[in-house]
Amino acid sequence: MSEKKNIYPNKEGCPVEFTLDVIGGKWKGILFYHMIDGKKRFNEFRRICPSITQRMLTLQLRELEADGIVHREVYHQVPPKVEYSLTEFGRTLEPIVLQMKEWGESNRDVLESYRSNGLVKDQQK
């Protein structure tokens, strides 16, 4: 199992940084969001996120599992079946992720406007 670069970031410091370490990054929040609706299998995540590599998906799920956010259920059958679901502890992050979703839906156009017409372009002139 891989180790995180920063297992316990700023342990005595910023709780926001600590939370972002758990659900931050390109894929963890997306994987988490899709597990809110229920269990997912590995290949379901591959269909949901076609640009994620198998290696990265495995690493992200392992990190979420190591943090106690995700439960990995292995069914001993042929072909092998593995399902991922949120733990009770993981569900405590659900309101945060749903609020992030709501913010994204409400502010996508504003952010895109800033990105296309905003400060970055003004500084390049």
From Swiss-Prot:
- Entries under SUPFAM superfamilies matching the protein: Winged helix' DNA-binding domain (SSF46785)
Q: Which GO terms describe its molecular function?
A: DNA binding
Q: Which Pfam families is this protein grouped with?
A: HxlR (PF01638)
Keyword Transcription regulation recorded: yes
Pinpoint the HTH hxlR-type domain residues.
14-112
Q: Does the keyword Transcription regulation apply?
A: yes
Q: Which InterPro entries match?
A: HTH_HxlR, WH-like_DNA-bd_sf, WH_DNA-bd_sf
Which keywords are on file for this protein?
DNA-binding, Transcription, Transcription regulation
Protein known as: Uncharacterized HTH-type transcriptional regulator YybR
Q: What is the source species?
A: Bacillus subtilis (strain 168)
Originating gene: yybR
